[in-house]
């Protein structure tokens, strides 16, 4: 059953998943965003912790992409075509650190240790 579900959502094997991925990619390119930019640190504290552990340059680039996207959205414009062509919406910068944070949290829970940071959503 699990292999069936994996095949169902794998863009390399499922036409509909491939079409959805292409649609999301086009929407992100219009504003110059990456998929990892869509994660909200106020919603999930693991994401907040992962962003705190990333180098400052990466976080600054993320904030700049988000500000540019909000500016373009409010102006009802898109990025110029030459800039859209060089965007990489599915290049991940957060997933590795997020996996590490989640693995550490799971290990702490398994050992019965106190969390490093409060795990409540504001």
Curated annotation (Swiss-Prot):
Name of a matching Pfam family: UCR_14kD
InterPro entries: QCR7, QCR7_sf
Main location: mitochondrion
Superkingdom of the source species: Eukaryota
Record-level GO BP terms: mitochondrial electron transport, ubiquinol to cytochrome c
One GO CC annotation: mitochondrion
Keyword match S-adenosyl-L-methionine: no
Compartment(s) where it occurs, according to its Swiss-Prot or TrEMBL record: Mitochondrion inner membrane
Bilayer topology term: Peripheral membrane protein
Keyword Transport among record annotations: yes
Cysteines paired by S-S bonds: none
Keywords: Electron transport, Membrane, Mitochondrion, Mitochondrion inner membrane, Respiratory chain, Transport
Family: Belongs to the UQCRB/QCR7 family.
Chain's role: Component of the ubiquinol-cytochrome c oxidoreductase, a multisubunit transmembrane complex that is part of the mitochondrial electron transport chain which drives oxidative phosphorylation.
Subunit (UniProt): Component of the ubiquinol-cytochrome c oxidoreductase (cytochrome b-c1 complex, complex III, CIII), a multisubunit enzyme composed of 10 subunits. The complex is composed of 3 respiratory subunits cytochrome b (MT-CYB), cytochrome c1 (CYC1-1 or CYC1-2) and Rieske protein (UCR1-1 or UCR1-2), 2 core protein subunits MPPalpha1 (or MPPalpha2) and MPPB, and 5 low-molecular weight protein subunits QCR7-1 (or QCR7-2), UCRQ-1 (or UCRQ-2), QCR9, UCRY and probably QCR6-1 (or QCR6-2).
Protein name: Cytochrome b-c1 complex subunit 7-2, mitochondrial
Species this protein is from: Arabidopsis thaliana
């Amino acid at each position: 059953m699990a292999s069936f579900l994996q095949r169902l959502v794998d863009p390399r094997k499922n036409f509909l998943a491939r079409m959805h991925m292409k649609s999301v990619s086009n929407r992100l390119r219009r504003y110059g965003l990456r998929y990892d930019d869509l994660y909200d640190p106020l919603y999930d504290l693991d994401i907040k912790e992962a962003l705190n552990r990333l180098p400052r340059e990466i976080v600054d680039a993320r904030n700049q992409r988000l500000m540019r996207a909000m500016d373009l959205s409010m102006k009802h414009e898109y990025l110029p075509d030459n800039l859209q062509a060089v965007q990489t919406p599915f290049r991940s910068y957060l997933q590795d650190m997020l996996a590490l944070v989640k693995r550490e949290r799971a290990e702490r829970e398994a050992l019965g240790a106190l969390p490093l940071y409060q795990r409540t959503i504001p």
